[in-house]
């Protein structure tokens, strides 16, 4: 999961500070999410999935299909 977060961020040409702002956390906190040293709250996972237009299942590694769910 953590590698997917980094890959998505890099694919969107973003730095950790930019993504941290989306989540309203510090860059240090986001860095810890991305490295796996801090568990990501479910609200942050949902926010990341919406931000990247993907599903939480994709972020968690439960699927390899990055497409979001239909609403």
What are these model-predicted stretches?
Residues 37-47, 68:
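Short, basic-rich loop-to-helix N-cap that marks the start of a DNA-contacting helix
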Residues 24, 43-58:
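DNA major-groove recognition helix of helix-turn-helix/homeodomain DNA-binding modules
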Residues 11, 60-71:
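Short, charged recognition helix plus adjacent turn
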Residues 24-39:
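Recognition helix of helix-turn-helix/homeodomain-like DNA-binding domains
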Residues 3-22, 47:
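Short basic helix-loop element that most often maps to the first helix and adjoining turn
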Residues 1, 5, 55-56:
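Hydrophobic side chains within well-formed alpha-helices
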Residues 5, 19-20, 30-33, 59:
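Conserved hydrophobic/aromatic packing and binding residues within compact polymer-binding modules
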Residues 34, 52, 60-63:
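DNA major-groove recognition helix of helix-turn-helix
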């Amino acid at each position: 999961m953590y590698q997917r977060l980094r890959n998505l961020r890099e694919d969107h040409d973003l730095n950790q500070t930019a993504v941290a702002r989306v989540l309203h956390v510090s860059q240090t906190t986001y860095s810890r999410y991305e490295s796996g040293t801090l568990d990501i709250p479910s609200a942050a996972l949902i926010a990341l999935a919406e931000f990247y237009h993907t599903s939480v299942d994709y972020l968690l590694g439960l699927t390899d299909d990055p497409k979001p769910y239909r609403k």
